[in-house]
Curated annotation (Swiss-Prot):
Pfam families: RHD3_GTPase (PF05879), Sey1_3HB (PF20428). GO terms for biological process: endoplasmic reticulum inheritance; endoplasmic reticulum membrane fusion. The chain crosses the membrane at residues 681-701, 705-725. Residues 1-680, 726-780 are cytoplasmic. Residues 756-780 are annotated as: Disordered. This is Protein SEY1. Belongs to the TRAFAC class dynamin-like GTPase superfamily. GB1/RHD3 GTPase family. RHD3 subfamily. Its EC number is 3.6.5.-. Its main location: endoplasmic reticulum. It comes from Vanderwaltozyma polyspora (strain ATCC 22028 / DSM 70294 / BCRC 21397 / CBS 2163 / NBRC 10782 / NRRL Y-8283 / UCD 57-17).
Length: 780
């Protein structure tokens, strides 16, 4: 186990925490699991007070020390850390019992090099208190009783910030403040010096601005105090070494009441955890502004430079609108005008503010420049938005141009995007080169444009992809509608095999130009594999939907009935040579009926379910249904809505009944026609007619009137039959007959009415005659 490691700079003088700290600690412990068996000691005090020398002697470290014979100056810069297992003491320690010690050498306070800038020494002191178990406060005996000399002002600030940052999280944790009084000659006893320092610290603690949760806390709740005097190193070297050994005993002798490594001082973190804790503490301390206490010069400089900044900015604003508005659409004039305004504003600030503290002057100048950039950004943004819109319009036009020399969309889009980006960056670079646009704003504007450009490119790609999907789907749909109904109109038992072969052939031929050797697809839109797969699936879904709709729309109940009836009639009415069949008897009709019926219904089950000739149901290789695979019919019965299911049981039964009725009618018609063709007048009837009608026939021939009438009748019959005028003749005959019957009915009605009217008159006259006779008889 190495007892000594070269020190590294844990925190630089520029306040950066080392990224190599954890690796250094691991190197120090050599891969051992030390757990929490380690200790952290820090030293704090004025510059050139011998802090590094004390640490090197006490802990056997190798921190750089000042050579007083050459020059008294700053030696330790920042905060350094070293590892050791050795302690100078009067006690021999077993090597296995030695702890790993990490010693922090903190840059001295009140140094000439930093002057009034006390920011780092405050933060370094606060960091040392926050991460250490023991903080050695190194001071000269003659500094005791002073306020600045013994760092009381610094400790006050550190205590206040320590309470605000870490006070509520202490949970009983304490830090040992070990005051090492150098060059103690013994005139003033240590007890007296201890009382003086303790009183000063208690009084200082009472004056602190404490947070509410620490209002009643005492100094002893956070810190324990120990005091040690060391003789003069040069004048009393032997006594000095002995005093250091006695000091080392307190770090080793655990049974000693004044043992310095008490458990309540430890942070109880493993070494890698302590490293992260230390880094977080430094970041928290670095961000805290309560430690940035400016000097009076800085306060004045800040006030005056702020005033000058505002005046300069007001002058710029007063000229801004009148100078900028007329040239806002002219890039070159706009850049020139903004540059002039910025130069005038900064020159005015420089003229009046450069006399103050340089750091503050430069800080405020940067602030003024940032405000100028912010003011300019409003105008530049308007100009850039207008330019961006023109660039995007040109991009869309170039990408969608049909006259482009680049046929592949992805390359066309990529080339157009690069042109648009380059054009925009050139414009922005002109503003940045004129220093009227900060680098941060430039990067932000370019990033925003790139985001908008990506969004526009993505939209163009999505639109083009959608067009491709739509175009491919339409092509596939049209070809499916040409092929599938034709195959289904004259189906065979292997109709579904042929339809599926056609379907896959149509799909493959449509997308063949996008297919790669590994059976994947690249639609040449510059998308990733996932986007190409999504496009392929969309086209595949559209193809399956088209096939599904075409089949299910075509194979309705009536269509299937017609297909079955046509198949029946084809087999029933025509022979194998497509010639009409003339039946001789009913047995032939019945036989043909059975054969044709079997032939017709052979295809019925094939049309009811989409399956291959191997009796395997066809299942789409992609899900394209938007709803459940069940639907409810008008009767409230649920049926499958799968692609392969054409007919349910109810529909199948309905179709069978309807087809049977239709083919039965066809058979009856066939039997009737057979009876008509077989029923005729016997030949002997014609012989009897000739024998019996011979005289009448001769009479007609010998009579010119009968001959002429017969010729007219035969000619009329010929023309009526030739031109198929039987319908009109029949209509005329029916009309004439109707007119004749109507006339006869009218005449009969008139006759009956006349008779009815005559009868009452006769009866009346007869009655009158009878009454007259009765009267005459009565008179006589």
């Amino acid at each position: 186990m190495d007892s000594k490691e070269e020190a590294i700079q844990l925190i630089t003088e520029e306040k950066h925490f080392s990224d190599d700290a954890l690796a250094y600690f691991k190197t120090c412990i050599g891969g051992r699991d030390v757990g929490v068996n380690y200790h952290v000691i820090s030293v704090f005090g004025s510059q050139s007070s011998g802090k590094s020398t004390l640490l090197n002697i006490l802990f056997n470290t190798s921190f750089d020390t000042m050579d007083a014979q050459i020059k008294r100056q700053q030696t330790t810069k920042g905060i350094w850390v070293a590892h050791s297992n050795e302690l100078l003491s009067n006690v021999d320690v077993n090597p296995e019992d030695k702890s790993d010690l990490f010693i922090l050498d903190v840059e001295g306070s009140d140094g000439l090099e930093r002057g009034e800038d006390q920011d780092f020494e405050r933060k370094a002191a606060l960091f040392a208190i926050s991460v250490s178990e023991v903080l050695i406060v190194n001071m000269w005996e003659q500094q005791i009783g002073l306020y600045q000399g013994n760092n009381m002002a610094l400790l006050k600030t550190v205590f206040e910030v320590n309470l605000s940052l870490f006070g509520k999280n202490k949970n009983g944790h304490k830090v040992l403040l070990l005051f090492v009084i150098r060059d103690h000659v013994g005139v003033t006893p240590i007890s007296s010096l201890r009382d003086t320092i303790t009183t000063e610290l208690i009084n200082l603690w009472e004056t602190l601005s404490k947070p509410a949760e620490c209002e009643n806390k005492k100094l002893s709740d956070f810190f324990e105090l120990q005091f040690v005097g060391l003789s003069h190193k040069l004048l009393q070297e032997e006594r000095f070494v002995q005093d250091v050994k006695s000091l080392g005993d307190h770090f080793i002798m655990k049974d000693n009441e004044d043992y310095y490594f008490k458990p309540e001082y430890h942070h109880n973190l493993p070494l890698d955890g302590w490293t992260l804790y230390a880094k977080n503490c430094w970041e928290l301390i670095e961000e805290n502004r309560d430690l940035d206490l400016p000097t009076q010069q800085i306060l004045v400089a800040r006030f005056k430079t702020e005033e000058i900044l505002n005046d300069s900015l007001e002058v710029l604003k007063s000229k801004y609108d009148s100078n900028v508005d007329p040239v806002i659409k002219d890039k070159l004039k706009l850049i020139q005008e903004l540059s002039v305004l910025k130069t005038e504003c900064l020159d005015m600030y420089d003229q009046h503010a450069s006399k103050y503290v340089s750091a503050v002057y430069l800080e405020k100048r940067d602030e003024l420049e940032a405000k100028i950039y912010l003011k300019f950004l409003e105008t530049i943004t308007l100009f850039i938005d207008s330019v961006s819109q023109d660039i995007f319009l040109q991009l869309v036009e170039d990408v969608n141009s049909e006259s482009s020399k680049e046929p592949i969309f992805s390359k066309r889009l990529s080339n157009s995007t690069e042109v648009a980006k380059s054009k925009f960056e050139d414009i922005i670079e002109e503003f940045a080169a004129a220093k009227i646009l900060s680098e941060e704003v430039k990067e932000e504007v370019v990033k925003r444009f790139e985001n908008d450009l990506k969004e526009t490119s993505d939209k163009l790609r999505v639109t083009a992809l959608q067009k491709l999907i739509t175009r491919s789907s339409k092509i596939i749909n049209a070809r499916i509608k040409d092929v599938v109904p034709q195959l289904l109109s004259n189906p065979d038992v292997d109709v579904w095999d042929r339809i599926m072969d056609k379907f896959h052939s149509i799909f493959s031929s449509t997308l063949i130009k996008y297919k790669l050797d590994d059976d994947t697809y690249d639609f040449q839109f510059g998308g990733e594999d996932e986007e190409n797969n999504s496009t392929y699936k969309s086209i595949r879904v559209a193809a399956w939907k088209s096939l599904n709709d075409t089949i299910h729309d075509y194979l309705k109940e009536d269509t299937i009935c017609n297909i079955l009836r046509d198949r029946f009639e084809l087999k029933f009415r025509y022979d194998d040579e497509d010639s009409p069949i003339l039946w001789k008897n009913e047995e032939e009709v019945d036989l043909a009926f059975r054969v044709a019926k079997e032939y017709a219904f052979k295809i019925f089950d094939v049309l009811a379910l989409i399956k291959t000739s191997d009796n395997v149901e066809v299942v789409p290789d992609i899900n394209f249904h938007d709803s459940d695979e069940m639907y409810e019919d008008d009767l409230g019965i649920y049926h499958s809505a799968k692609f392969s299911h054409i007919l349910n049981e109810v529909q199948k039964e309905k179709i069978q009944i309807q087809v049977r009725r239709q083919i039965n009618v066809t058979v009856l018609d066939a039997k009737r026609s057979m009876i008509k063709t077989t029923t005729h007048i016997p030949l002997w009837i014609y012989a009897i007619i000739v024998v019996l009608g011979w005289n009448e026939f001769m009479m007609v021939i010998r009579n010119p009137l009968f001959v002429t009438l017969t010729i007219l009748i035969l000619v009329s019959f010929y023309f009526i039959n030739k031109f198929d005028l039987w319908g009109p003749v029949k209509s005329v005959a029916q009309t004439a007959a109707g007119e004749t019957i109507g006339t006869i009915k009218t005449k009969l009605r008139d006759f009956v009415l006349e008779e009815h009217e005559k009868t009452p008159k006769i009866q009346s006259e007869k009655s009158n005659s009878d009454s007259e006779k009765v009267v005459e008889n009565e008179k006589s």
